[in-house]
Amino acid sequence: MNRRIITTLCLMAVTIGMMASNDVKTAQNLARRILGNKAQTVVFKKIDSTKDVFTLESNLGKVVISANNANSMAMGLNHYLKNYCHTAISWYKDDPIELPETMPAVKEKVRIESRLPMRFFLNYCTYGYSLPWWTWREWEHFIDWMALNGVNMPLAITGQESTWYNVWKKFGLNDEEIRSFFSGPAYLGWHRMCNFDAFMGPLPRDWMDRQQTLQKQILKRQRELNMTPVLSGFAGHVPAKFVEKHKGLKYTDVSYWGSFKDPERYRCRFLFATDPMFAKIQRAFIEEQTRMYGTDHMYCIDPFNEVDPPTFNCDSLAMLSRGIYESLAAADKDAHWLQMSWTYKYMPGWNSERMKALFRGVPQGRLIMLDYWCENVQMWKTTESFYGQPFIWCYLNNFGGRNRLVAPSDRIYNYIDNTYEKAGSNFSGVGATLEALDVNQFAFSMLFDKAWNMPGSLNEWRNSLADQRMGRIDEKARKVYRDYCERVLDVPRTYNYTFVESRPGMKKKDKCTPTREAQNEIWKEMVNLNSDRDGYKMDVVNIGRQCLEEHFYVLWRKFVVAYDCYDLKEMKRLGSEMKEVLADEAALTACHPVFSMKRWIEQARSWGNSAEEKDYYERNARRIVTVWNNNLAGLNDYAGRPWDGLLKSFYLPRGSMFVDRAIDCRERGIEYDEDSFVKECYEFEEKFCELEVPIEYPQKQDPVQLSRQLLKKYCE
């Protein structure tokens, strides 16, 4: 490992050590939050080690967890819970924690060491698709989950608008100009990445104040748990009003993003790092942010997310990255720059020479790259391991929170092993860059386990998953879950969303999954297992609603054929069944709170102090999971969710509109006009986003009993 990288890791260790002086007490407090009264059966001890390490053993009726810091102690506790208590801890506060009546003993002492120093978590997008409405109640448990899984580098970008508000005021902007620059709360992740300004704004001042308070709570707890929060740095994104008031700046208009109506209204401005003003803004921001929140010297800066750079000239790219880093180092001499690599895969124009110029413009060891989507594209393989800069292997999993049955345990397990073997000494960590949380959680638990020298094969890990779902060892369940992983979750897909959650029409692309028959079989096998565990019930609902969505797709294909054949009778029969399937899926998803829209809406409205403010936040919440932007084309349904309220009040009415329009056309002897229907559909979608369509929530039922009824109805 080169000297620069060693220096980087040592600085992280020093920072963490300074922030966590009482690890045992911190771990005990976490155990009480997770275990309640059963926390008294667990004892924590601190040991010296140059690596993150924990041991487990039983002594005098207690489980003794010894580790080098509170983060490792939490990881040790989770290892005990998963492998001895058969208990999985969800990242959602409201999901139950189900423990055995008697906490089991550890028969033989276990010692496990970390193989990688960096364990990164989160994504700018997660702050829009899952986190915008959370309070300290949800965050406290979420941070506990991070610690339980060994996360020590969380992206921590809550509350940065308060910092920017103060900075832009110093540079002459007034309240209205600043708040109108910011987007609405659900869209701040993309505003922070310099994708667009102002959309769904202006941002309420009360929101900024409360987010500032929340960020202080978040950072305090993360630092107590030996984490290095990744704060924001200045990437070059400046308000249009700032450019107007400071003449002669060297800047450019960023390329359009997001297919908005009136795109110029939302277009971003990018200040060149070579302009003297860049370093002034960087220093002002870092100093103000440090005053507000402290610093751990790790900053996320992503200047070109899904937009073109000002130039692709290699010398200019090297100068640009050097300028960003030097401005950062001038404000904080210990600064490290964390950057995601997504845009270098996503955007055309980035070849190896250009990436090398950009990455090597920063001193070796001071730029840390997130290899963002490694289950599909491992960029370290095509960039000479990021040309020597430290990198983190990341599992992305989902786009927009579209809850497909995707959790490729085989690729995670084997690809990381291959990275250990071949990537070189600058392979520095693993991370999760998920866009949203409404997905299969267990793959992330395995991901972070791979940062440690955990014993066991891939099949043993799958067996452990079944044990956690059952709360016991059950060989029948183990086989079902091994099949679930191998035949469904591990199967590669070229898309990550379902037909139900996309706008209907005659010209839709083929989206039928290659695992449809396997899904039906495993759903049937799963409902015949016997468990009261919440995670098991969630799995039953998850695979069941996917089976229903695949059945809907089959019906749609037949409906299109019937339309082409002028078979009106068959169209009516199929159309009626399509509507019924959507209603049944809404009923099934209402069986588990993970699939409820009610929590999302109630949390959004809770941030408002008046009816007007509550409606403002709900409009943000509704739009981002439906239309997304303000146009009939572009990002619509990108963040579609299989939620009960969306199914009953959005997808079902929209699907019914399509069925009824097609039938009406055949009855009247005219051809169906797709463009006309899309416009009609968009009018309904906008009414939903503007709160003109009420959300109905189906009554909750028993998921296993309802699944048996639906299996008999659709799969026999």
Walk through the language-model features, giving the residues of each.
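Bacterial Sec-dependent N-terminal signal peptides
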Residues: 1-22
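Coil residues (strongly favoring Ser/Thr
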Residues: 8, 20-21, 41, 49, ...
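Contiguous, structured surface segment used for ligand recognition
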Residues: 21-116
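Catalytic-core regions of glycoside hydrolase
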Residues: 39, 88, 94-103, 122-126, ...
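N-terminal structural segment of carbohydrate-active enzymes
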Residues: 75, 116-159
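Extended, compositionally biased alpha-helical segments that mediate assembly or anchoring
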Residues: 643-716
